[in-house]
Regions:
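N-terminal intrinsically disordered, cationic/polar leader segments
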Residues: 1-198
């Protein structure tokens, strides 16, 4: 099977994004978004999902990181959508409980063709460094809308905001890594009784 790799650009008046994603990679990454914390989260996502991800974003970070974070989520979702197409042959579902020290997060995904984000995450601070914590939800909302996909994050424990968000991105990597795997026994089938995912 050929590697499932895609490159895309997404340019607006607020951000310019170049992205290459290999769904069948080994977890290699080169990421520069202009936001150190977002870089860190995307590196964790790629490593734990075993995706190869090369991404640069030039955004209006002199304002804040909102546009950069949201638009990177949108672009990453678009990359998944374009590469997976009609979702033929994939497992479709993935879930993972990720412990990060005192934090415990569940991420569950359904590459369903329908957008839902359940963000049941309760951070204890509004910022990690200079990153606004609320931007993490905007990232995953942009991603879920662009695939489109159903994505659930549920927090069972956690006090340290960095640990909570790190567990979210690592868990999402594991869950999406499982969801995009090819089902060798049914690789020519769309994983739905409807015959269509929408």
């Amino acid at each position: 099977m050929e590697n499932r790799m895609i490159s895309l650009e997404r340019n607006t008046n607020e951000t310019q994004i170049d992205l290459t994603l290999d769904l069948d990679g080994s977890g290699r990454y080169e990421i520069d978004t202009g936001c150190g914390f977002l870089n860190h989260m995307l590196e964790l996502f790629a490593r734990h999902g075993r995706f190869d991800l090369v991404l640069t974003c030039h955004g209006d970070v002199e304002v804040d990181y909102h546009h950069t974070t949201e638009d990177v989520g949108i672009a990453l979702g678009q990359a998944f959508a374009r590469e997976l197409g009609d979702m033929r042959g994939i497992q479709r579902y993935g879930s993972f409980h990720l412990p990060m020290d005192e934090a415990l997060i569940l991420c569950a995904v359904d590459l369903s063709g329908r957008c839902t984000l359940n963000w049941d995450i309760h951070c204890t601070t509004e910022k990690v460094g200079d990153f606004d914590v609320e931007c993490a939800k905007e990232f995953w909302l942009g991603f879920a809308r662009s695939v489109p996909a159903t994505v659930h994050f549920v927090q069972f424990a956690g006090e340290n905001t960095h640990h909570i968000l790190e567990a979210c991105f690592k868990g999402a990597g594991h869950a999406l890594g499982a969801a995009v795997k090819i089902d060798e026994a049914h690789k020519d089938e769309i994983p739905s009784t409807k015959g269509l995912l929408v």
